[in-house]
């Protein structure tokens, strides 16, 4: 990880605090993982404040596979089975079956429809009947211990929401370059500068939690 590129966003703790402040005000953050892991950066928004314009940005600027990060108890409450019984993904990414809101959507693929699906899944009264499958939103189940258990974007997303005092649900999508290749840290920083966002890393979040005993 090129720490020099990250210095403009502050120290390890400052980057996390800035990210939390952004999420509390409905803004997005960019989270990078290690170069020896996925070596990717994800654009992340709080699920409870997500807007169609923010969803459209994710669809336009990112991979298009918009994921809803959920803690295990919410996955269970919604009755979502895992996508496969035996996960052979290199990173062990815990996809459930994809979802669509049962009501209030058309084809489910538009930005507004995907936001509606996210809202249906995180509603306080949400139940299995509130959703249909398959759909155009891809839930991910976070490990219970967060980034201290698994250093993935899924866990970082849920941890950030909890630390920000928000509902523990977040939406992410991998940032891509205009040619379709994956954005690495230099491109992530450039995107952040152009869109007035902050960048932090999964390792920042690990250190923050460990230092504060969270």
UniProtKB/Swiss-Prot annotation:
Domain of life of the organism encoding this protein: Bacteria
Reactions catalysed, as given in the entry: D-ribulose 5-phosphate = (2S)-2-hydroxy-3-oxobutyl phosphate + formate + H(+)
UniProt keyword Lyase, yes or no: yes
Top-rank EC class of the record's enzyme: lyase
Subunit organization: Homodimer.
GO molecular function: 3,4-dihydroxy-2-butanone-4-phosphate synthase activity; magnesium ion binding; manganese ion binding
Top-level taxonomy: Bacteria, Pseudomonadati, Thermodesulfobacteriota, Desulfovibrionia, Desulfovibrionales
Binding residues annotated for Mg(2+) 2, in chain numbering: 38, 153
SUPFAM superfamilies given in the database record: YrdC/RibB
InterPro entries: DHBP_synth_RibB-like_a/b_dom, DHBP_synthase_RibB
Record note on cofactor: Binds 2 divalent metal cations per subunit. Magnesium or manganese.
Entry cofactors: Mg(2+); Mn(2+)
Protein name: 3,4-dihydroxy-2-butanone 4-phosphate synthase
Residues holding D-ribulose 5-phosphate: 37-38, 42, 150-154, 174
Site (Essential for catalytic activity): 136, 174
GO process terms (BP): riboflavin biosynthetic process
Entry similarity comment: Belongs to the DHBP synthase family.
Naturally occurring in which organism (per UniProt): Nitratidesulfovibrio vulgaris (strain DP4) (Desulfovibrio vulgaris)
Keywords: Lyase, Magnesium, Manganese, Metal-binding, Riboflavin biosynthesis
């Amino acid at each position: 990880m090129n720490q020099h590129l990250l210095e403009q966003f502050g120290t390890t703790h400052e980057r996390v605090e800035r990210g939390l402040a952004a999420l509390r005000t409905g803004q997005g953050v960019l989270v990078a993982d290690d170069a020896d892991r996925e070596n990717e950066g994800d654009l992340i928004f709080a699920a409870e404040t997500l807007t169609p314009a923010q969803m459209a940005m994710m669809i336009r600027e990112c991979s298009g596979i918009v994921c809803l990060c959920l803690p295990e108890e919410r996955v269970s409450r919604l009755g979502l089975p895992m996508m496969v019984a035996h996960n052979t993904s290199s990173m062990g990414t815990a996809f459930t079956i994809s979802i669509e809101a049962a009501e209030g959507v058309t084809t489910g693929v538009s930005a507004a429809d995907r936001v509606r699906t996210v809202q249906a899944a995180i509603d306080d009264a949400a139940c299995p009947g509130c959703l249909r499958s398959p759909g155009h939103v891809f839930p991910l189940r976070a490990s219970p211990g967060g980034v201290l258990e698994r250093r993935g974007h899924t866990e970082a997303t849920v941890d950030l929401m909890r630390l920000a005092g928000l509902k523990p649900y977040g939406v992410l999508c991998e940032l891509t370059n205009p040619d379709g290749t994956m954005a690495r840290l230099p491109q992530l920083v450039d995107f952040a500068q152009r869109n007035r966002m902050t960048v932090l890393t999964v390792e920042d979040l690990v250190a923050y939690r460990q230092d504060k005993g969270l």
